[in-house]
Design a protein with these regions (language model features):
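ABC-family P-loop ATPase nucleotide-binding domain
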Residues: 1-27
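Short beta-strand immediately N-terminal to the Walker A/P-loop
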Residues: 49-50, 105
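The feature captures the beta-strand-to-loop junction immediately N-terminal to the Walker
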Residues: 52-55
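Short helical segment in ABC ATPase nucleotide-binding domains corresponding to the A-loop/adjacent helical element
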Residues: 67, 118-126, 137, 141
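Conserved catalytic motifs of ABC-family nucleotide-binding domains
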Residues: 73-74, 110-119
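ABC ATPase NBD coupling module
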Residues: 75-77, 88-104, 127, 133
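Conserved ABC ATPase "signature" region
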Residues: 81-88, 133-150
Length: 150
């Protein structure tokens, strides 16, 4: 058995955490209703973080805030900071489409938009300015083939 000298002082230092995201004083409003109230949180890089809570407590609202999915909700307002590599993703000069290449979402249950399969597949491309029908048709066909649905 190892014997310790309890009179000897041992200083243990831990390395700084490398953060994937840092949340500072995050508030989310739907009109006058405050859905998220001042969250401060850090997500460590290469670690799994679980958000647990009862239905309606704001988990989905919080997650949607991380990559600005709440931007599509007219009455939603987000304040505070969501820092990715030191940059606030809520800044007005952020290219949302480029940012979402780095901060993606994979939900437990697929939740397509209330549109056709074709429109769900072409949605992001159309938002980026792709308008050519032949190009969009090719994107849909390729996507469905890759998913084994063509």
């Amino acid at each position: 058995m190892t014997k310790y000298n309890w009179d000897e002082r041992h200083i243990i230092t831990f390395p700084e955490k490398e953060l994937a995201l840092e949340i500072k004083d995050l508030h989310v409003y739907y009109g006058q209703k405050e859905a998220i109230k001042g969250i401060d949180m850090q997500f460590e890089k290469n670690k799994i973080t679980a958000l647990i809570g009862p239905s309606g407590c704001g988990k989905s609202t919080f997650l949607r805030s991380l990559n600005r999915m709440n931007d599509t909700i007219d009455i939603a307002k987000v304040t505070g900071q969501i820092l990715y590599q030191g940059v606030d993703v809520n800044a007005s000069n952020i290219n949302v489409y480029e940012m979402r290449k780095h901060i993606g979402m994979v939900f437990q249950r697929p939740n397509p938009f209330a549109k056709s399969i074709y429109r769900n597949i072409t949605f992001a491309h159309e938002r980026k300015g792709v308008r050519d029908k032949q190009t969009l048709d090719e994107i849909v066909e390729t996507s469905l083939k890759q998913a084994g649905l063509w």
